[in-house]
Amino acid sequence: MPSSQISHQDPELGQTSSGSSSIKEKAEPQLYAGPIDPARRPDVFQEGFEDVSVTDDDNDNELLRKMGYQPVLHRSFEFFESFAASFASLDVVSGVRLTFSWGISFGGPAAYWSAMLVTGFCSIVTAACLAEICSALPAAGSIYLWAAESAGPRFGRFVSFLVAWWSTTAWTTFVASITQSTANFIFAEVSTFNNPWPTNDSDVKFRAVQWIVAEVLLVFTILLNQVPPRYYKWIFKASMLLMFIDYVMNIIWVPVATSKKPDGFRSAKWVFTETIYDQAGYIKEVDDANGNPIASLSKIVPKGWQWCLSYFATAGVIVGYDASGHIAEETKDASIKAARGIFYSTVTSFIVAFSLAILYLFCCPDLDTFTAILYNDNSPQPFVNFYSYLLGRGGHVVMNVVIILEIFLNGVVSVLACSRLVFAVSRDGVLPFSNWISQVSKTGQPKNAITVIYIVSALLLCTILPSAVAFTSLVSAAGAPSFAAYAVLAFCRLFITRDKFPKGRWSLGWLSKPCLVITLVYNLFALVVNVSPYTYPVTGPSFNYAVVIMGGVSIFAIICTIVIPKSRWVANRYRYESDSEHSASVKELKV
């Protein structure tokens, strides 16, 4: 092992790699984000290390040291902040609005509500599996470290690199998509008030303005993440308050307004049994240059697959609940509170999402009006038109202001979770420029990781300029890598470390393996749906680039696994070396 990698100072003993030592009563605060000396790192697979949990807040940092890391982040979050991190990142109140028209277009109301029900159940099961893992390994970056442990000594390094790149891609694209959706809700007011200024995504001039506004919103989102950690609690509270107000306004105001419309509510039969197969190309007639129908392009999307595509509108809403795990190093009694944050935020999100989906279905206008409103090409966010139809111009503006502020603050929370993931991955040497990215400020803030998120998200927003379906691709790219990572975790725990994985205080017991099977099957299915095309026939401008992003990121992960020396990969390093290599490294440490 190169001496440059072992020359850091042990904060407990005050001893350097040169062999000199100074006895200290108390170690000075360290901002070094790297691991403890490898010779001191325990192997979590060794006997006597199965339970890595603690029962006292004061032992949180000791638990982190047992996992091999120096505690450098500011630990101040309680269960509320852990819950809010995932709940705000999911933001299903906004998510249902963003994808509602897609859910109806693929299979109709029957497909949409049933897909939401299945998605909710499977997401809760997946969250339970992640919570069990988080309880055993509550560290920043969570899912990346969990992958290393789940894949075992033989495959851990490769799988962790793959999941690290997938997860960082998912969260950075998620940040970009949030800022763009915020801009869409702003510009939707233009078409609502019949302003002649074009707001059609096919207009490149509008996309240029849309891009500028999204970039500005991203800057403010990043700036709010530069505040000292003690102020984050207020951001969490403000975000939760706005989501509560938004939800209450919807469940009270929307049905009251619907009852005053001539058509009133839709029937239960329409909501629960109606199918619609005319939006994704099933009976769409495609003409040639002479205006004659092209038979080969008629009925190009089978009904069964259209039904499956409705899961894009539901699975993409309830994903990202690993956020509580990303801030585990800043959460007190994390082995319990972070795990509960993952699970209960997902349960609550499903209840909110399902209730809103059913509410909106009952409040839908007749099909012609519905099509004119929610498939309005002149509005970047047609759901604003739906509110305008129900609540009137004045009422819908109030609702839209709450929505815009809510999405913006949830973007701030998402950057918080994402920055902890990027920090954790870089401190283990997985990303390029890891030494710089993993540096932490005096206030325990990974500011360089936040800067990296800004740069990547800003570049991703540039896809708005050439593509009219960039937003759809960003949403898919935000969900697809997460589904892939969840599936890989379940696969590894089922087939590689099924009886070896460390146990935490939050456990599923005998239900663990059945839940892992459900997690694996569901997330593989959701992955396929999220990378598939949505507009037919598929052309360059309408292509879903999520599959390209996933493929490119996977290639980068494989290249990094090959190029980056094994000695630079810090997490559980000695689990991947032979006994002779381990002994030689320990001997070098003692020289």
From Swiss-Prot:
It is found in: Endoplasmic reticulum membrane; Cell membrane. It comes from the Eukaryota. Pfam families: AA_permease_2 (PF13520). It comes from Schizosaccharomyces pombe (strain 972 / ATCC 24843). The modification Phosphoserine is found at residue 585. The keyword Cell membrane applies. It is a multi-pass membrane protein. Residues 1-42 are annotated as: Disordered. GO terms for molecular function: gamma-aminobutyric acid transmembrane transporter activity; high-affinity thiamine:proton symporter activity. GO terms for cellular component: endoplasmic reticulum; endoplasmic reticulum membrane; medial membrane band; plasma membrane; plasma membrane of cell tip. Keywords: Amino-acid transport, Cell membrane, Endoplasmic reticulum, Membrane, Phosphoprotein, Transmembrane, Transmembrane helix, Transport. Residues 1-22 have a biased composition (Polar residues). The chain crosses the membrane at residues 98-118, 342-362, 397-417, 450-470, 545-565. PANTHER family: AMINO-ACID PERMEASE BAT1, THIAMINE TRANSPORTER THI9. The keyword Cell membrane applies. This is Thiamine transporter thi9. Its main location: endoplasmic reticulum. Thiamine transporter involved in the cellular uptake of thiamine. Pyrithiamine, oxythiamine, amprolium, and the thiazole part of thiamine have been shown to be also substrates of thi9. InterPro entries: AA/rel_permease1. GO terms for biological process: gamma-aminobutyric acid transport; thiamine import across plasma membrane. Belongs to the amino acid-polyamine-organocation (APC) superfamily.
